[in-house]
């Protein structure tokens, strides 16, 4: 039965019972085609029956019984012990009761052949690990059967790396995990289960959702008892006092940091202690990491100067680990991690070479495992040890002895400070050149499970000297100062005995009765609070989890790091005598006590539904791709959609959940289509960036046809912006055009054409058509021919499998040319062909061979698309000489290497087909005049290869050894000669041959049957009408140009006069040419591309949508207009006008979702495409006085900043909330806000005040970072040029460049006052002194200075907007006119 039909039901449970009787714990448990996960435990004599019985009591708890008998009350009250319970364990019955309580199916095969099977419908509890069945094959064993392999990560691992997983102690994340824990408690309490929570029993899903294995405490009782781990300070004291060896202490430190042997990315780390140069010396410096010793301080400082700033990537990389273990690791692992190609000679052969080569630290195997020297690979020699030892065993003993050497012992604490200690802290690591990448890596995708773990926050104590004198107490004093005393005494607070007859004693007795009555519930509540404390204090636990005493000690030591509401809750852990909430009210009590926001409570509830549905699908209990499975997917997607709308600060959860759906073959398409709109509106930019790679991988999938649809692509382009879309998403869409899947190729082609029209000709030429040209070669990568026969037999009948796919790409390019202009052919298509041929000529490669075939298709397309006049201008010098003749010289020269002779022959066939198409197009006379070179080359080559004897038999000609001509097969020569002889006749064909007699054997059989058209074609040239083609019926009839006719140079800007086949004007063609030819964008030629008319008064502000095909304008006539950029029109009216403003519009900006914010004193946020008003906000002040909102500026995708003319504060508006979210005070002194600018998503905000003060603050928290005093009291605009440089523009003063680091100072003054300024990615555009346009690079270097003439723009320029993708400028004037100029 196929996997698709598997569904968990009673019949499957019966089938499973048959399999279990023969299953062994180490075997794979496979039910039909589904692999299940199972684990088995046995009860034996050494099992602690009492401890096991306690764990069962917690699961089968009956203490919460209001009808508790009176005798038990009296026993508790009088302190009489309850009668001892029987230790006999009713094993199978208890498991059956557990299964019934948790709705788990139960199988009992212990009394074979009789079986008891109890099927339960699967009930998913989102915070509990799902179990399909509990089974017994013997009377003393138990088997737990799970569904899909667990996706979760050990929760302790997540907490160890909390610096990345819970950055900066994120209170929202802590609240979310706490809510998970409270929901779990409620789920268990409703089933009367009193679990004692431990972090080791939790797993954390990638979406930060906690799952608890409720049966894990029972299974722990079957494992061999593990020696309790001693506290870290005690272990440190043992090492310092020489009770422990260095090896034992390093093993302990690696253990508590979660490093496990065998894990490639998380293996234990030991130090290299010597360089193996001598037997008793050569010790390394332990106060520096091996990476620093290997790379040097200069390189580490240079790495710190780059982003992200760090010194050490990792102390033990996967490459280093695999190289160390190269002799014992399988070859597949080595090729996966080290190098794909297996080259055993590249691996270090000796220990000294290993030490010199590696920048990584050592591994413990070099101190305890001699087998690591013996190679399991026949082609790799054993690892050689130093000469002063004779065997691997002796080396291990010697190396271990070196590790325990006194020189190492007295300096090991320095190495521990670098690897486990205080030098890992950010501030200390900068001075020690020890800042690790894992601490500064931003926007990491998913939960971190590897990296450094800091155990000590103080310098590590040194080891007791070997010759320590007890009379000298200096060492003990040092140890006390470090906090590692030799003894520790705990003072006990004196207990106050209450008065015997006091009400307090009576109350305490009542509490004692109640506490003991519900002791298991009380312990469960305490353990839940201990887990919460470990979440809050994860960075300070030093790897010691589930230790109640250590947790309480850390709460006391780091109380200042604990949020106040959690601090009050943790008071219950120190005073257990105080009133605890009732067990049924615990979750509500903690939620209220912690003041968990309602948003997080609602989000957790909705997200829990999504997790439950996802778990249900992944348990393999429902057939995938079935109707039921599709229904569950729809519900899961809808739950995730609601969660995204509620997520606010819990983006990590929804991003991880969305990634899981993207990686799910069944759910990915529906998820993307349904969630993309809400993701665009809700998530931050950093969260969206995490989704880029999964979405690109999904688009690249051959089955994802729907994701190439234009509706989805529109959402993606809006979501990520045009720059990111063109750079990252467009290439895989273009690649889809070359897919062998016809549906995928057709949809991709249509979408690309839609994008080409949407973005316009300039962007199309720079990004779209250039990529389409490159992808054509991929159609021919295999050089497979149509049919079973793969060897070409006829020159003009070679058809490749990629021809059909390439024809679709060809039609796409043709449509682009038809839509815009032949300029695309003359400045892009043909130069691309020439460039590719030149690359092959310089260095032939297998990768470029398919490109030669694509070149022929591009040339053929160009010939069909160009007019007669255009073709003849580019024919001889360009198409014939630089393409066809150049390719033939390569093909007919044997010194150029091809992957095979078959490939070379196929390419020769294709170039002959192209040459034939050209001759059909231009006719015989034009062929003789302009296209004779390829024919002369071919026939001269043929005559040098072959010769004829007196009997007209064709033989190979004897050639000198230095002759490098390729030996063209005889059948190819016959085909070529026969084809052209039939069409032109032998006399005309012989004009291309130096030795016409060579043709006689090839045409002797066909000359007698020459057709009449051939005889006409071979008439003397005088019989032709002047400039006439002749009687050719195929192709256009062209006029022949004389040899003296001028041919336009290919380097001209696209032929401004060759635009008759498209809709573009000559000026637009010039812009396309400049863009393709890579002409510097820093130019202004005073060319007007388009006029926009509609405003009646001054243009205040211009803003463009990221794709630059639409823009908006704000005017003093109280309107905001939406415009489209249409290259085919010279004058355009507005698309839509927003008319709800009642005063002149001051400012305007466009949000990431293309909604528009404009202000006339009141903030209006509206959607121009749905023509709806989204929000309208006035400036409401706490003082009661309003004011006019004068400026608005984007902070990030969803947040706007606004300033008012009557206040000195900045307000933030969140488009997701639809209102003000906070108000930031920008200066402690007087002064009103005048201008504002934002950089780096709110990290830096600069606000200019009326008193000349410039305030620089962080918009995320409102912190003022700097205040600078300038002379600008009437500032009209402020613009960030770089991280530390600003342009301040004043209405009366000249603009100034202001440097803010280290102290604010003026770098440079501009020549004139700046009336308008706009910043792009790499340039600053300004309008100065009314009519002067100046463009500066970000460094401040002047690039353009020109004057806008009155005949170019009526009125005075008042607003400017550069369009960098289109290499043009929008300029607005005081008369309301707008011009698109270049």
Curated annotation (Swiss-Prot):
Gene Ontology BP terms: early endosome to late endosome transport; endosomal transport; organelle fusion; positive regulation of early endosome to late endosome transport
Phenotype seen when the gene is deleted: Coelomocytes contain larger early and late endosomes enriched with PtdIns3P. Delayed conversion of early endosomes to late endosomes with early endosomes retaining PtdInsP3 for a longer duration of time which may possibly be due to a delay in either the turnover or transport of PtdIns3P out of the endosome. This leads to continuous fusion of early endosomes which continues until rab-5 is displaced and rab-7 is recruited. Double knockout with sorf-1 results in a similar phenotype as the individual single sorf-2 knockout.
CC annotations in GO: cytosol; early endosome; early endosome lumen; early endosome membrane; endosome membrane; late endosome; late endosome lumen; late endosome membrane
Keywords, in A-Z order: Cytoplasm, Endosome, Repeat, WD repeat
Location of the protein in the cell: Early endosome; Late endosome; Cytoplasm
Domain BEACH: 229-463
Gene3D superfamilies: BEACH domain, YVTN repeat-like/Quinoprotein amine dehydrogenase
Organism superkingdom: Eukaryota
Spans of repeat WD: 1094-1133, 1140-1176
MF term (GO), any: phosphatidylinositol 3-kinase inhibitor activity
Record-stated family: Belongs to the WD repeat WDR81 family.
Physiological role: Together with sorf-1 negatively regulates the levels of phosphatidylinositol 3-phosphate (PtdIns3P) to enable the conversion of early endosomes to late endosomes. Binds to sorf-1 and the sorf-1-sorf-2 complex likely acts through bec-1, a non-catalytic subunit of phosphatidylinositol 3-kinase (PI3K), to suppress PI3K activity, thereby negatively regulating endosomal PtdIns3P levels.
Subunit structure: Interacts with sorf-1; the interaction is direct. Interacts with bec-1.
Name of the protein this chain belongs to: Suppressor of organelle fusion 2
Lineage of origin: Eukaryota, Metazoa, Ecdysozoa, Nematoda, Chromadorea
Gene this chain is encoded by: sorf-2
């Amino acid at each position: 039965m196929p996997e698709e039909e598997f569904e968990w039901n009673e019949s499957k449970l019966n089938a499973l019972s048959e399999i279990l009787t023969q299953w062994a714990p180490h075997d794979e448990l496979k039910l039909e085609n589904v692999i299940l996960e199972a684990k088995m435990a046995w009860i034996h004599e050494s099992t602690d029956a009492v401890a096991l019985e306690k764990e069962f009591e917690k699961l089968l708890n009956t203490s919460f019984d209001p009808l508790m008998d009176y005798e038990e009350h009296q026993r508790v009250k009088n302190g009489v012990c309850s009668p001892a319970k029987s230790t006999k364990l009713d094993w199978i019955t208890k498991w059956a009761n557990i299964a019934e309580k948790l709705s788990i199916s139960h199988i009992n095969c212990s009394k074979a052949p009789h079986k008891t099977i109890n099927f339960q419908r699967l009930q998913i509890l989102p915070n509990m690990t799902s179990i399909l069945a509990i089974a017994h094959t013997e009377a003393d064993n138990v088997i737990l059967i799970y569904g899909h392999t667990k996706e979760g990560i050990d929760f302790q691992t997540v907490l160890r790396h909390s610096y990345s997983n819970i950055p900066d102690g994120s209170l929202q994340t802590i609240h979310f995990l706490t809510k998970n824990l409270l929901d779990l408690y409620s789920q268990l309490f409703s089933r009367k289960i009193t679990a004692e929570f431990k972090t080791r029993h939790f797993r954390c899903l990638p979406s930060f959702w906690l799952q608890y294995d409720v049966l894990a405490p029972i299974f722990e009782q079957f494992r061999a008892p593990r020696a309790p781990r001693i506290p870290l300070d005690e272990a440190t004291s043992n090492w310092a006092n020489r009770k422990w060896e260095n090896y034992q202490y390093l093993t302990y430190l690696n253990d508590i940091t979660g490093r496990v042997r065998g894990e490639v990315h998380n293996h234990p780390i030991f130090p290299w202690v010597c360089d193996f140069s001598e037997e008793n010396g050569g010790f390394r410096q332990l106060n520096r990491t091996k990476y620093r010793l290997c790379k040097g301080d200069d390189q580490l400082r240079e790495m710190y100067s780059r982003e992200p700033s760090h010194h050490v990537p990792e102390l033990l990389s996967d490459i280093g680990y695999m190289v160390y273990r190269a002799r014992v690791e399988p070859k597949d692992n080595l090729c996966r991690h080290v190098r794909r190609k297996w080259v055993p000679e590249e691996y270090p052969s000796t220990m000294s070479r290993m030490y010199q080569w590696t920048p990584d630290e050592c591994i413990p195997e070099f101190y305890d495992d001699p087998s690591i020297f013996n190679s399991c690979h026949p082609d790799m020699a054993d690892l050689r040890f130093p000469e002063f030892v004779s065997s691997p065993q002796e080396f291990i003993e010697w190396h271990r002895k070196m590790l325990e050497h006194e020189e190492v012992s007295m300096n090991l604490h320095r190495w521990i400070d670098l690897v486990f200690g205080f030098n890992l802290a950010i501030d200390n690591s900068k001075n020690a050149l020890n800042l690790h990448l894992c601490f500064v890596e931003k926007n990491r995708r998913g939960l971190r499970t590897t990296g450094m773990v800091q155990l000590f926050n103080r310098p590590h104590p040194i080891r007791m000297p070997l010759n320590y004198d007890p009379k000298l107490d200096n060492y003990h004093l040092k140890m006390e100062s470090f906090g590692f005393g030799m003894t520790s005494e705990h003072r006990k607070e004196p207990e106050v005995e209450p008065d015997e007859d006091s009400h307090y004693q009576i109350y305490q007795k009542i509490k004692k009765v109640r506490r003991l009555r519900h002791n298991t519930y009380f312990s469960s509540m305490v353990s839940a609070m201990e887990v919460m404390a470990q979440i809050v204090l994860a960075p300070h636990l030093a790897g010691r989890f589930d230790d109640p005493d250590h947790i309480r000690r850390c709460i006391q030591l780091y109380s200042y790091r604990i949020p106040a509401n959690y601090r009050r809750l943790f008071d219950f852990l120190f005073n257990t005598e105080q009133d605890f909430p009732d067990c049924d009210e615990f979750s509500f009590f903690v939620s209220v006590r912690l003041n968990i926001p309602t948003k997080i409570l609602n989000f957790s509830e909705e997200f829990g539904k999504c997790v439950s549905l996802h778990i249900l699908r992944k348990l393999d209990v429902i057939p995938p791709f079935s109707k039921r499975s599709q229904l569950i997917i729809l519900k899961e997607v809808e739950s995730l959609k609601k969660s995204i709308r509620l997520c606010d600060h819990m983006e990590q959860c929804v991003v991880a959940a969305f990634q899981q759906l993207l990686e799910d073959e069944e759910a990915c398409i529906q998820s993307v289509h349904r969630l993309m709109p809400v993701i665009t509106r809700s998530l931050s930019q950093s969260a969206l960036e995490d989704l880029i790679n999964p979405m690109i991988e999904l688009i690249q999938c051959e089955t994802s046809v729907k994701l190439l649809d234009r509706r989805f692509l529109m959402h993606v382009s809006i979501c990520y912006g045009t720059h990111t879309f063109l750079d990252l998403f467009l290439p895989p869409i273009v690649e889809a055009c070359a897919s062998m899947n016809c549906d995928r190729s057709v949809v991709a082609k249509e979408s690309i054409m839609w994008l080409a029209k949407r973005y316009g000709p300039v962007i199309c030429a720079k990004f779209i058509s250039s990529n389409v040209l490159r992808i054509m070669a991929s159609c021919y990568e295999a050089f497979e021919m149509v049919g079973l026969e793969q060897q070409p037999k006829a020159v003009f009948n070679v058809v490749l499998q990629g021809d059909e796919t390439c024809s679709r790409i060809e039609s796409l390019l043709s449509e682009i040319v038809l839509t815009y202009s032949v300029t695309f052919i003359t400045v892009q298509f043909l130069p691309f062909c020439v460039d590719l041929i030149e690359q092959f000529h310089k260095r032939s490669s297998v990768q470029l061979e398919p490109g030669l075939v694509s070149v022929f298709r591009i040339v053929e397309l160009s010939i069909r698309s160009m007019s007669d006049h255009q073709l003849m201008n580019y024919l001889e010098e360009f198409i014939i000489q630089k393409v066809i003749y150049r390719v033939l010289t390569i093909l007919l020269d044997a010194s150029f290497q091809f992957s095979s002779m078959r490939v070379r022959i196929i390419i020769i066939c294709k170039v002959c087909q192209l040459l034939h198409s050209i001759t059909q197009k231009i006719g015989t006379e034009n062929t003789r005049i302009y296209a004779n070179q390829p024919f002369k080359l071919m026939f001269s080559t043929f005559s040098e290869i072959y010769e004829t004897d007196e009997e007209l038999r064709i033989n190979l000609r004897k050639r000198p050894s230095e002759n490098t001509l390729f030996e063209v097969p005889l059948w190819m020569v016959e085909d070529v000669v026969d084809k052209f002889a039939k069409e032109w006749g032998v006399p005309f064909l012989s004009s291309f041959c130096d030795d016409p007699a060579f043709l006689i054997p090839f045409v002797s059989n066909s000359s007698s049957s020459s057709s009449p058209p051939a005889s006409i074609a071979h008439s003397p040239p005088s019989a032709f009408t002047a400039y006439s083609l002749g009687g050719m019926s195929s192709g256009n009839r062209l006029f022949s140009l004389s040899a003296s006719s001028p041919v336009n140079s290919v380097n001209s800007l696209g032929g401004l006069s060759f635009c008759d086949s498209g809709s573009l004007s000559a000026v637009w063609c010039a812009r396309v040419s400049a863009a393709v030819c890579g002409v510097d964008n820093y130019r202004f030629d005073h060319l007007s591309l388009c006029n926009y008319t509609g405003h009646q008064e001054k243009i205040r502000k211009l803003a463009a949508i990221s794709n630059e095909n639409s823009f908006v304008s704000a005017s003093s006539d109280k309107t905001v207009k939406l415009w489209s950029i249409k290259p085919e029109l010279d004058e355009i009216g507005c698309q839509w006008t927003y008319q709800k403003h009642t005063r002149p519009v001051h400012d305007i900006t466009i949000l990431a979702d293309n909604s528009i914010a404009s202000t006339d004193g009141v903030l209006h946020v509206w959607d121009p495409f749905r023509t709806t008003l989204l929000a309208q906000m006035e400036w409401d002040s706490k003082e009661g006085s309003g004011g006019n909102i004068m400026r608005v500026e984007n902070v990030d995708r969803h947040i706007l900043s606004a300033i008012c003319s009557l206040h000195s504060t900045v307000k933030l508006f969140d488009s997701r909330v639809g209102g003000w979210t906070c108000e930031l005070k920008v200066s402690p002194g007087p002064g009103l806000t005048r201008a504002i600018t934002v950089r780096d998503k709110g990290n830096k905000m600069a606000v200019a005040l009326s008193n000349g003060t410039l305030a620089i603050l962080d918009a995320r928290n409102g912190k003022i970072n700097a205040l600078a005093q300038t002379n600008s009291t009437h500032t009209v605009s402020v613009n960030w040029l770089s991280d530390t440089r600003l342009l301040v523009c004043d209405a009366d003063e000249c603009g100034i460049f202001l440097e803010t680091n280290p102290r604010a100072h003026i770098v440079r003054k501009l020549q004139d006052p700046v009336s308008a300024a706009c910043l792009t990615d790499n340039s600053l555009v300004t309008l100065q002194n009314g009519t002067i346009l100046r463009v500066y690079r970000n460094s401040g270097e002047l690039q353009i200075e020109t004057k806008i003439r009155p005949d170019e723009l009526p009125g005075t320029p008042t607003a400017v907007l550069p369009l960098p993708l289109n290499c043009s400028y929008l300029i607005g004037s005081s008369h309301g006119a707008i011009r698109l100029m270049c």
